[in-house]
Curated annotation (Swiss-Prot):
GO terms for biological process: ADP-L-glycero-beta-D-manno-heptose biosynthetic process. It catalyses: D-glycero-beta-D-manno-heptose 7-phosphate + ATP = D-glycero-beta-D-manno-heptose 1,7-bisphosphate + ADP + H(+); D-glycero-beta-D-manno-heptose 1-phosphate + ATP + H(+) = ADP-D-glycero-beta-D-manno-heptose + diphosphate. The gene is hldE. In the N-terminal section; belongs to the carbohydrate kinase PfkB family. This is Bifunctional protein HldE. It comes from Haemophilus influenzae (strain ATCC 51907 / DSM 11121 / KW20 / Rd).
Length: 476
């Protein structure tokens, strides 16, 4: 499949559906409340994530594809928070804000990696007049290559038939990840993507491949679909179309850690590929590869074009290890599109010692990815003297690449990495030692971009100079 590509130059996707904000409160639990037999959680940090149709849009944005998201939110703080979260990922939000309903919000309280409680803030949208939403759809859909209707049963898609008709009238394919057992309401859609359980709940138990094909083709005929893609967990996925041979794709997942959000990834990649003018076969192939990547991650995750391209061509992921500046810029862009926090530091790292290890581990804990910029041999010589470095650049970077705390390594030739930091613009710049933040090379560039700068302490008594002096004493 070497001709397949994860670069979607022509694609533009519109997503309409039940948008949600997922909130997580994390804290320690050390005692029981005197008021009731319940644990007391001392909240120490919180996190916000896009949920429902908003997560579908995040998946598309992670592929560097323009995406607009439509849905219903409340005129409230959570609606504003969700919009801000999405806009940071360059998702075009085109919501209808209601006075009468809250933004759908799910608040989870966790302690010691266990969920203690979930609080849902929502009201059914089935009684809402969706004429404004339909008008937005009719105005915008012609500008997109595909429409995803994301149904979580909250009522945003109560007029789903009208939505399908609007899109089909504009010759825009409609893809739906269905909810419930009433597939009749999706009549006329281009493609449905039920999982095996959802499929069997509608057509009945399937004991053989032949039954899946027979019942799937009947469903296509009954509700006038163009195609049906049944996702089958460890058995891969099967594409069915009238008068064409079934197209079966075996799973490509090496290890399955978490299937959360895999359905969102499948429909996102499918729609993106179709919007880019790819065939059903190629689109399903890419979606299957993406699903294999995302189930190997913990929690709701997205897939980047770097990961997808490498998986297509069976290359090891370039998202880790030693990189050129150009490769690093691409990897950072992909990571930021996934909402990851980028931390960057720099140094000579001539003879790696416990102080370095501790410092890098602490730096890595401050974000999702750690970049280490390493002085070239000439740069070290200018800074440290003619006798340095002890280890050349290739060896220094090879040792650093073996550390679990380090994601990306990049060399620089100047005396300071100021230019490089200005090109990469990490979310957080860290440096070890007695520096003041404003003295750190690249701090002005990071601050100007809205990032932060932090000084970390080195372990006392650990330094490359001390190691070298001890070696000299042994030699003497």
């Amino acid at each position: 499949m070497a001709q397949y590509s994860a670069e979607f130059k022509q694609a533009k996707v519109l997503v309409l559906g039940d948008v949600m904000l997922d909130r997580y409160w994390f804290g320690a639990t050390n005692r029981i409340s005197p008021e009731a037999p319940v644990p007391v959680v001392r909240v120490q940090e919180n996190e916000e994530r896009a949920g429902g149709a908003a997560n579908v849009a995040m998946n598309i944005a992670s592929l560097n594809v323009p995406v607009q998201l439509m849905g219903l939110i409340g005129q409230d703080e959570t609606g504003s928070a969700l919009s801000l979260l999405l806009e940071k990922q360059k998702i075009d939000c085109n919501f209808v804000a209601l006075e009468t309903h809250p933004t759908i919000t799910k608040l989870r309280i966790l302690s010691r990696h266990q969920q203690l409680l979930r609080l849902d803030f929502e009201e059914d949208f089935n009684n809402v007049d969706c004429k404004d939403l339909l008008a937005k759809l009719e105005s915008a859909v012609k500008n997109y290559g595909a429409l995803i209707l994301s149904d979580y049963g909250k009522g945003t898609l109560k007029d789903v038939q009208k939505m399908i008709q609007i899109a089909r009238k504009a010759n825009v394919p409609v893809l739906i990840d269905p909810k419930g057992t009433d597939f009749e309401r999706y009549r006329g859609a281009t493609l449905l993507t039920p999982n095996m359980s959802e499929f069997e709940a509608v057509v009945g138990k399937c004991n053989t491949e032949e039954e899946i094909i027979e019942k799937g083709l009947k469903l296509i005929s009954d509700i006038e679909l163009t195609a049906l893609l049944v996702t089958r967990s460890e058995k891969g996925m099967t594409l069915l179309r009238p008068n064409q041979e079934p197209y079966h794709l075996p799973t490509v997942a090496k290890e399955v850690f978490d299937v959360t959000g895999a359905g969102d990834t499948v429909i996102s990649v499918l729609a993106t590929a179709l919007a880019d003018g790819r065939s059903f076969e190629e689109s399903c192939y890419l979606a299957n590869v993406a699903a294999g990547i995302v189930v190997g991650k913990l929690g709701t995750s997205t897939v980047s074009t770097v990961e997808l391209e490498n998986a297509i061509h069976a290359r090891p992921e370039t998202g880790f290890g030693i990189m050129s500046e150009a490769e690093l810029k691409d990897a950072v862009a992909q990571a930021k599109a996934r909402g990851e926090k980028i931390v960057m530091t720099n140094g000579c790292f001539d003879i790696l010692h416990p102080g370095h290890i501790s410092y890098l581990e602490n730096a890595r804990k401050l974000g999702d990815r750690l970049i280490v910029a390493v002085n070239s041999d000439d740069s070290v010589k200018r800074l440290k003297g003619e006798s340095r470095p002890i280890n050349n650049l290739e060896n220094r970077m090879a040792v650093l690449a073996g550390l679990a705390s380090v994601d990306w390594l990049v060399p620089f030739t100047e005396d300071t990495p100021q230019r490089l930091i200005g090109e990469i613009l990490p979310d957080l710049l860290v440096k070890g030692g007695d520096y003041k933040p404003e003295e750190i090379a690249g701090s002005k560039e990071v601050w100007a971009n809205g990032g932060d700068v932090k000084v970390l302490n080195f372990e006392n008594g650990c330094s490359t100079t001390n190691v070298i002096e001890k070696i000299k004493l042994l030699k003497d």
